[in-house]
From Swiss-Prot:
One of its GO terms (cellular component) is nucleus. This is Protein LOL5. It comes from the Eukaryota. Residues 1-25, 33-44 have a biased composition (Polar residues). GO terms for biological process: defense response; positive regulation of defense response; positive regulation of growth.
Amino acid sequence: MSQLPLASQATTTDLVSTTAMQPQSEGIVDESLQPQHPPSSTAHDSPCLQDSVPLVPPPPSPYLNKEVGQMVCGSCRILLAYFRGAGYVHCTCCQTMNYVLEAHEVGKVHCGHCATLLMYPFGAPAVKCSLCLFVTEIGERNVRRRLSIEQPTRTNSSGLAEA
């Protein structure tokens, strides 16, 4: 088996230069040096499939157009900012994981001593003011009513209550 001259041997592993390289000696023809996939005559006649596919914009980033909420850390009382919809907020000062309450889970009452507006989770019996440390009892007027009590009962024409 004859060897190719050094000038015709590939010195790089580039696929394009390897397939396009032709031997310099006239009598040697190597089939492995030919292009692997010649262009098809039907490839130019068929329409491009990408043109027929409707382009859909990528979904927005989960952090764009998000509302930012604020809460006070339950341990060190520092103000924390978080994206709305988060279940927990991590305080970087004291490493506490704070549970985030939604608006419908929070009650509001004024402090019985300094009249500061206080927020508390529904069901709490009392709230301690962070300014004057006074404990305000959550009375019956501040307890969230049940849904069945909030909805008035309707009566039909025969005098029976409807659900």
